[in-house]
């Protein structure tokens, strides 16, 4: 009798378990992952664009909410020595993985050596870390997207007219990122307009100077159509101001790099790119999505922690965002 009762109870136990009753499941293993961010100093932006370290960190905080991760955060503050100290602190905290964002190659080599000694894997953001998979932008490709957009605009709207290219931004910045973007822009334009010449206006890292520099240029270059590529979105805003003040809206067009809040506006009412503002001289901006890095990088981290093979380099999805697709890429409400 006891045996029959036991057999009868088994289907009931199975049914209860299927409804969530019964012994608690241990759940998935949780991992400790550290992000050592490049620089979270207020007012400091990343990679010559308009994104801040705080925005990048927030994307990791939000993306981690649905993953079995316990996150630790470090601010390298743009200091190689501090980056090494932060890596040592992550090792002492016995993290399962370090996500390192540091621009100094010597410091990265030392960080990689210490991580290897501790047996801790790493993911690198933007700048290579020896032995680590890399996630970051493809600056040359992003530049080409802008250049092709400008070339196509001139072909479709200004055929057989006198056209000149203008590149505005921090042209003297250290590192390869700016030079790669400039090379991509020129290649992209020349795919449509092989003989186009470019004027270079260097803001020296001060986007506000784009207004005055372009104003002087517009006063000299009259009677020409101008294809303007700005290397950051705030420079695009100031360039647009110069065009408006000089009443040159009919013969200037701008494509920028970044797609930060200066251009897409987020949830605010002030938007440079807007379906209701299709007459703007700002045609669009090439997206870098640095404010969404967490959503792309943490899945890579989970794959590494699961023992999967991850490509040596994963590049950001770059896309030209205009008034026609801005609400698809950055809806006018808080996505988080």
Feature annotation, model-predicted:
Residues 182, 186-199, 226-227, 231, ...:
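Extracellular/periplasmic periplasmic-binding protein-like sensory domains
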Residues 88, 97-116, 185, 203-266:
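Hydrophobic alpha-helical
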Residues 138-168:
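A conserved helix-loop-strand patch within extracytoplasmic ligand-binding domains
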Residues 29-30, 169, 189, 288-336:
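Hinge/cleft segment of the Venus flytrap/periplasmic-binding protein
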Residues 4-5, 11-26:
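N-terminal export signals
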Residues 57-72, 191:
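Signal peptide-proximal N-terminal region
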Residues 36-56, 73-82, 104, 136-145, ...:
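Hinge/beta->alpha junction and helix N-cap segments in small-molecule ligand-binding domains
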Residues 106-141, 261-273, 278:
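Flexible loop/hinge segments that line or gate small-molecule binding clefts
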């Amino acid at each position: 009798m006891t045996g029959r009762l036991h057999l009868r109870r088994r289907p009931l136990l199975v049914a209860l378990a299927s409804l969530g009753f019964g012994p608690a499941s241990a759940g998935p293993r949780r991992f400790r992952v550290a992000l050592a961010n490049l620089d979270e100093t207020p007012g400091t932006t990343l990679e010559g664009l308009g994104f801040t370290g705080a925005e990048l960190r927030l994307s990791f905080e939000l993306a981690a909410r649905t993953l079995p991760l316990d996150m630790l955060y470090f601010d390298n503050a743009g200091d190689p020595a501090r980056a090494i100290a932060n890596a040592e602190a992550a090792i002492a905290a016995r993290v399962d993985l370090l996500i390192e964002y540091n621009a100094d190659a010597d410091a990265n080599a030392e960080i990689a050596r210490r991580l290897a000694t501790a047996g801790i894997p790493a993911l690198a953001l933007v700048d290579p870390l020896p032995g680590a998979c890399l996630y970051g932008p493809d600056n040359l490709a992003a530049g080409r997207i802008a250049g092709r957009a400008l070339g196509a605009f001139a072909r479709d709207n200004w055929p057989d007219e006198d056209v000149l290219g203008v590149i505005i931004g921090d042209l003297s910045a250290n590192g390869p990122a700016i030079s790669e973007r400039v090379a991509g822009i020129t290649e992209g334009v020349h795919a449509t307009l092989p003989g186009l010449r470019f004027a270079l206006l260097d803001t020296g890292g001060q986007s506000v100077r784009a207004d005055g520099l372009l104003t002087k240029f517009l006063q000299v270059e009259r009677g020409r159509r101008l294809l303007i590529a700005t290397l950051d979105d705030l420079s695009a805003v100031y360039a647009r101001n110069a065009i408006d003040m000089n009443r040159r809206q009919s013969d200037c067009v701008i494509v920028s790099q970044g797609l930060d809040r200066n251009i897409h506006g987020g949830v605010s009412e002030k938007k440079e790119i807007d379906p209701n503002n299709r007459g703007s001289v700002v045609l669009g901006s090439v997206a870098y999505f640095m404010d969404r890095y967490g959503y792309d990088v943490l899945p890579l981290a989970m794959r590494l922690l699961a023992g999967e093979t991850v490509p040596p380099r994963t590049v950001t999805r770059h896309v030209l965002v205009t008034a026609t697709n801005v609400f698809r890429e950055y809806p006018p409400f808080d996505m988080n």
